[in-house]
Curated annotation (Swiss-Prot):
Residues that coordinate or bind ATP: T17, T18, S19, T265, G308, Q312, G409
Gene Ontology CC terms, in alphabetical order: cytosol
Lineage: Bacteria, Pseudomonadati, Pseudomonadota, Gammaproteobacteria, Pseudomonadales
Function as written in the Swiss-Prot or TrEMBL entry: Key enzyme in the regulation of glycerol uptake and metabolism. Catalyzes the phosphorylation of glycerol to yield sn-glycerol 3-phosphate.
Keyword Nucleus carried by entry: no
The protein's name in its UniProt record: Glycerol kinase
Residue numbers binding sn-glycerol 3-phosphate: T17, R87, E88, Y139, D243
Pathway as given in its UniProt record: Polyol metabolism; glycerol degradation via glycerol kinase pathway; sn-glycerol 3-phosphate from glycerol: step 1/1
Sample GO molecular function, one term: glycerol kinase activity
One Pfam family recorded for the sequence: FGGY_N
EC main group: transferase
Gene3D superfamilies, alphabetized: 3.30.420.40
C-alpha cells in the first residue's frame, strides 16, 4: 500500500491504435482532465501496418504532461498510474539502449500470414486453441515476434544472449517510464500473444520452440492490479489491462454472466466466465479478464465486423443521411422496418458464422418500403449481430446473460439501445461515464494502492445513466430474430472460393 492521503488523483494512460490519451480521475471517479495526441500510421506494403515505438512513448508522455497542466496539478498529487493499451501490437528493443530494433508491428498487420499458414500445415491449430484460447491468426503477437527475429539480422542470437526484450505496448511503456528498471506485462495482455498458456498462467515452451523465440526476451507476467514499479518522478505504476479487458472492468463486469459491448466501427463483446476457461464451439476467443480484485478471471470474446461502419455506409456511399446522429430520428418515424432486413456482411461474417465468402444484402423489399425503413433496418442489424454473439457465448459458457453494459459512440442512440434490449430480452445498462476503458485502468491502479478500498466502493462510482428494459413480447422478439437468421442464411457463401474461379 502507498500513502495516498494527500494524493487525490489517478492518471490513466490509454494508448490506442491511432492516438495516445491521458485521463485524470479524482476520488469520485470523475474526469478532471484529458489530453490526446495522434501519431503516424506507417503502411510500408499492402496489408502491413507499423507504428514508431519512440513516437508512441513521446505522445504518451506529452499527453500526461498536458493533462496535468490543464488541471493545474503536479506529479506529487498523483497517487498512481494505470495503463491500458491496444493489444497484440509487438515491440522488440535493446536492453542497454532502450532503442527498438524495428518498428512496432500493429495488431492489424497481416505480414505474418505465411508463418501462420505453416503452423496450420504443421497441425498446430487445435493445440493453439486449447492452450492459448486463440485462433491461429496473424492478429496475435507470436507470429509478429518470429517475423522480426527472422528479418532483423543477428536479432535471434542477440535475443538468446539476453540483449533484446519483447513486449506488447504496456510492457514497452512501463520499461520507458521506469527508466529501464521493470520488464513486465499483465495476464490480459499475455493472453493475446499466442505464446501464453492461459490454464497454467505461464509462457508456453512448445509455442516458443515452434516459433523459435528465446525465452530470455519475455517479460514477467503479473496480475492486472499491483505496483509494478515507479515512474522516474516517483509515481507508482499500479494497473495494466488490454483495452477490451479494461473496458470490461470499468463496466464492473467482474462476475460470471456479466457482459459488455463496445459499439464502434465493429462491436467488441466480452463476457466474464469467472474461474472457468470456456472453450468455444462457435469461434469465440477464450481470453483472460479481471475478477473483483484485478485477479485472473476468464472471458469469452467475440467481434462483429460491421457495426458503426454500416451507418457510415448509409451516410457516405448511399447518401441516405447527412449525419450518423440522424439515424435515431428516421428510425423512430416508422413503427417497424416493414419486413426489411439489412445484413451488413461487407467483409464477410464474423462470430459466430466465420464466413469470409458471405456478402451484404437487403431483404424484404416491396414498393411500400421507404428510406426510413432501410435506416431502421441498418440500426437493427447491429442489435441482431450482437444477439448472435451473445447467444453463442451463453451456449458456450452455460451462463445466463444477467445484463448487457454498453459503451462506445453508438450508445448515444436511444433507438438502438431500446431495440437491443428488446431483441435480447435483457436489460441494457448505459453508464454515465463513457470513458470506460480508461476508467478500468484507473480502477485497477487505485485498488492496488488502497486509493479505493474495494469493488463495493467502486460500484457506487460506476453510475448507470439509463437502463433500457425489454418492451417486446417474447413471441414477437423470436419472430423478428427468426427473420434475421433467415436473411443471414441467404447471404452465406455468396462469393466464389478462390479455387472455383
Amino acid at each position: 500500500m502507498t500513502d495516498t492521503q494527500n494524493k487525490n488523483y489517478i492518471i490513466a494512460l490509454d494508448q490506442g491504435t491511432t492516438s495516445s490519451r491521458a485521463i485524470i480521475f479524482d476520488r469520485d471517479a470523475n474526469v478532471v482532465s484529458t489530453a490526446q495526441s495522434e501519431f503516424v500510421q506507417h503502411y510500408p506494403q499492402a496489408g502491413w501496418v507499423e507504428h514508431d515505438p519512440m513516437e508512441i512513448f513521446a505522445t504518451q508522455t506529452a499527453c500526461m504532461t498536458k493533462a496535468l497542466a490543464q488541471a493545474d496539478l503536479h506529479h506529487d498529487q498523483i497517487a498512481a498510474i494505470g495503463i491500458t493499451n491496444q493489444r497484440e501490437t509487438t515491440v522488440i528493443w535493446e536492453r542497454d539502449t532502450g532503442r527498438p530494433i524495428y518498428n512496432a508491428i500493429v495488431w492489424q498487420c497481416r505480414r505474418s500470414t505465411e508463418i501462420c499458414q505453416q503452423l496450420k500445415r504443421d497441425g498446430l491449430e487445435e493445440y493453439i486453441k486449447d492452450t492459448t484460447g486463440l485462433v491461429l491468426d496473424p492478429y496475435f503477437s507470436g507470429s509478429k515476434v518470429k517475423w522480426i527475429l527472422d528479418h532483423v539480422e543477428g536479432s535471434r542470437e542477440r535475443a538468446r544472449k539476453g540483449e533484446l526484450m519483447f513486449g506488447t505496448i504496456d510492457t514497452w511503456l512501463i520499461w520507458k517510464f521506469t527508466g529501464g528498471k521493470v520488464h513486465v506485462t499483465d495476464y490480459t495482455n499475455a493472453s493475446r500473444t499466442m505464446l501464453f498458456n492461459i490454464h497454467t498462467l505461464e509462457w508456453d515452451q512448445r509455442m516458443l520452440d515452434v516459433l523459435d523465440i528465446p525465452r530470455e526476451i519475455l517479460p514477467e507476467v503479473k496480475s492486472s492490479s499491483e505496483v509494478y514499479g515507479h515512474s522516474k518522478s516517483g509515481i507508482p505504476i499500479a494497473g495494466i489491462a488490454g483495452d477490451q479487458q479494461a473496458a470490461l472492468f470499468g463496466q464492473m463486469c467482474v462476475e460470471p454472466g456479466q457482459a459488455k459491448n463496445t459499439y464502434g466501427t465493429g462491436c467488441f463483446l466480452l463476457m466474464n466466465t469467472g474461474k472457468k476457461a470456456v472453450k468455444s464451439a462457435h469461434g469465440m476467443l477464450t481470453t483472460i479478464g479481471c475478477g473483483p480484485r484485478g485477479e485472473v478471471a476468464y472471458a469469452l470474446e467475440g467481434a462483429v465486423f460491421n457495426g458503426g461502419s454500416t451507418v457510415q455506409w448509409l451516410r457516405d456511399e448511399l447518401k441516405l443521411i447527412n449525419d450518423a446522429l440522424d439515424t435515431e430520428y428516421f428510425a423512430g418515424k416508422v413503427k417497424d422496418s416493414n419486413g426489411v432486413y439489412l445484413v451488413p456482411a461487407f467483409t464477410g461474417l464474423g462470430a459466430p458464422y466465420w464466413d469470409p465468402y458471405a456478402r451484404g444484402a437487403l431483404f424484404g423489399l416491396t414498393r411500400g418500403v421507404k428510406v426510413d425503413h432501410i435506416i431502421r433496418a441498418a440500426l437493427e442489424s447491429i442489435a441482431y449481430q450482437t444477439r448472435d454473439v451473445l447467444d453463442a457465448m451463453q451456449q458456450d459458457s452455460g451462463e445466463r446473460l444477467k445484463s448487457l453494459r454498453v459503451d462506445g459512440g453508438a450508445v448515444a442512440n436511444n433507438f438502438l439501445m431500446q431495440f437491443q434490449a428488446d431483441i435480447l430480452g435483457t436489460h441494457v445498462e448505459r453508464p454515465q461515464m463513457r470513458e470506460t476503458t480508461a476508467l478500468g485502468a484507473a480502477f485497477l491502479a487505485g485498488l492496488a494502492i488502497g486509493f479505493w478500498s474495494s469493488l463495493d466502493e467502486l460500484r457506487n462510482k460506476a453510475v448507470i445513466e439509463r437502463v433500457f428494459e425489454p418492451a417486446c413480447e417474447e413471441a414477437h422478439r423470436e419472430k423478428l430474430y427468426a427473420g434475421w437468421q433467415k436473411a443471414v442464411a441467404r447471404t452465406r457463401d455468396w462469393e466464389p472460393h478462390e479455387n472455383e474461379e
